[in-house]
C-alpha cells in the first residue's frame, strides 16, 4: 500500500520542483476515513445484567490517526496522507458500544466514561490495526482485538476474555479499500463477540 502511495507522492514532489519557486503552493490534502462496521444481529436471549464499556486501549504503533503499513516483519511505516477522522480508540469504542446495544446481549449498556455502576465491565485491547504489505502480491488488512469482562464489585482479574483476529485480503491497493476492509472486519469481530457473550450466561 505504501509503495503505491509513495509513487503518487514522488510524482507530486517532481511536479512541485518543476513549478519553480512559486510562493503559493497548495498544501497536501489528507484523506480521512471512519471505521463504520455493519450493524450486529440481535441474539436470541438477553441477559438481565448490565454492562459498561470500560477502556479501549490501542497498541502504541497504531494509536495515532495516520494509517499504518507493515512493510516487513519489523518495519512499520505511517501514511501521512491517509488517516482516520479521529484516533482509532474512540472510533472502536463507539463501535463496540453500538454493537452491544444492537445485539441486545445485556438488559442495559452503559456508555464509556460513566461511573462503573454496572454488573460487568468490558475492556478491549487492540493489538493490530494495519495494512500488511509484506507480500505485495497479497496485501491485506490486519485487525486483532482482545476483550476482557470483569465484575467491578469483585476480583480484579477478568471473569472472561477472548482474542479475536481477522485478516482481509485487499482486492485493490488503496486507502479506501483498506478502510472498508477494516470496517468489515470490525463488524465481523463484534458479531462474534456478541454471540460469545450471550453464550456465557454470566451469573449475578
Feature-to-residue mapping (PLM):
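A structural "domain/chain start" motif
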Residues: 22-89, 199-204
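Extracytoplasmic/secreted envelope proteins and their assembly/folding machinery
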Residues: 89, 93-97, 103, 183-186, ...
Amino acid at each position: 500500500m505504501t509503495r503505491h502511495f509513495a509513487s503518487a507522492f514522488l510524482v507530486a514532489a517532481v511536479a512541485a520542483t518543476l513549478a519553480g519557486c512559486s510562493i503559493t503552493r497548495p498544501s497536501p490534502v489528507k484523506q480521512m476515513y471512519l471505521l463504520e462496521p455493519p450493524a450486529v444481529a440481535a441474539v436470541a436471549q438477553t441477559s438481565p445484567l448490565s454492562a459498561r464499556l470500560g477502556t479501549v486501549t490501542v497498541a502504541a504503533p497504531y494509536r495515532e490517526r495516520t494509517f499504518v503499513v507493515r512493510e516487513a516483519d519489523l518495519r512499520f511505516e505511517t501514511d501521512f496522507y491517509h488517516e482516520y477522522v479521529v484516533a482509532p480508540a474512540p472510533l472502536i469504542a463507539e463501535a463496540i458500544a453500538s454493537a452491544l446495544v444492537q445485539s441486545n446481549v445485556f438488559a442495559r449498556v452503559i456508555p464509556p466514561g460513566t461511573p462503573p455502576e454496572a454488573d460487568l465491565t468490558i475492556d478491549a485491547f487492540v493489538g493490530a490495526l494495519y495494512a500488511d504489505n509484506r507480500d505485495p502480491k497479497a496485501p491485506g488488512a490486519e485487525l486483532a482485538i482482545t476483550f476482557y469482562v470483569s465484575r467491578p464489585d469483585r476480583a480484579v482479574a477478568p471473569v472472561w476474555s477472548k482474542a479475536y483476529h481477522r485478516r482481509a485480503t485487499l482486492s485493490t491497493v488503496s486507502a479506501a479499500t483498506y478502510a472498508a476492509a477494516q470496517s468489515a472486519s470490525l463488524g465481523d469481530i463484534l458479531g462474534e463477540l456478541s454471540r460469545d457473550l450471550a453464550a456465557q450466561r454470566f451469573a449475578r
